[in-house]
Amino acid sequence: MKTTVFLLLFSAQVVAQHHTRLNPATIEVHYHHTMQRDTVRRLATETDSMILRIGASASQFFSRHTFYYDSLWNDPDGRATAEALTLEAFRMRNHSKEPRVGTTYDYLYKNYPAGRVTTTNEQFHVACRYDEATPSISWVMADSIRTILGHPCRMATADFRGRRWTAWFATDIPVSDGPWKLGGLPGLILEAYDRGDDYRYTAVRIVESGLQPVTFYCFDGKPFFDTDRRTFLRSQRAFLSGQGNVYDIELIRAIVQSGRRKTYMQREAHRLLFDPLERDY
């Protein structure tokens, strides 16, 4: 409860410091998210709490844990709190309350700018940004129906970014949106998962009042480093797996050449045990 209250207070503070308010939110969906960190042995399931905040002209999707982490570490008072919580976690050997990044560093902004999806990510210790055309997903409707959070839902399937997705959309909520980059159905997606169940999003709460506005976050107030989707994803995989010299990684090389950051730690080469969410790069 204390974490939730603190998060709400920081939400208002961050919006006041570095932000672009896009539009008032009309509905917000909270999803329980699971991903397999080891898709071979399936022994490491990571969980997260994701937020989809929807307005009339744009929406945003992000990890609540990552937002909490970024809010703390990019605020002078919050940094002191984060350091105290981190030290306490090590002292107690209990890291459950330590500020941490969730399953992803990504913040997604749909239809911002119009007809585009913008992603920001600070995994390379510099706030990177790329945008892409709003995905056109070829969904195939099925006859299966079920109820989620009291809403009648219909099933649809599609191949998207190298995965076979199943989505359940609410037929009584005519909002063409959903978790992550999924959307394009005649109703709000309340559950989605890929064929191997490596990634799953399940709605656990729908909120329609007292909402924060849909807001484009810039936590440190510095300009974003712009790139493109495939360059970012290729570089991310190479960085995480320690492939080759860190300064030969495409995006890191560009960041260093720009002067935004000078040094990166060389990671030990290893095989990633999980498949990234997107496979088409």
Where would I find each of the regions flagged by the language model?
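Short beta-strand segments that buttress and anchor functional surface loops
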Residues: Y31-H33, R154-D159, L190-Y193
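Extended beta-strand-rich segments in extracellular/periplasmic secretory proteins, especially
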Residues: C128-A170, S176-G178
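Extended serine/threonine-enriched, polar tracts that run as long, contiguous segments within proteins
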Residues: T166, P174, E191-G196
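A recognition module on extended beta-rich or small alphabeta surfaces enriched in W/G with H and D/E
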Residues: G184-L190, G196-Y199
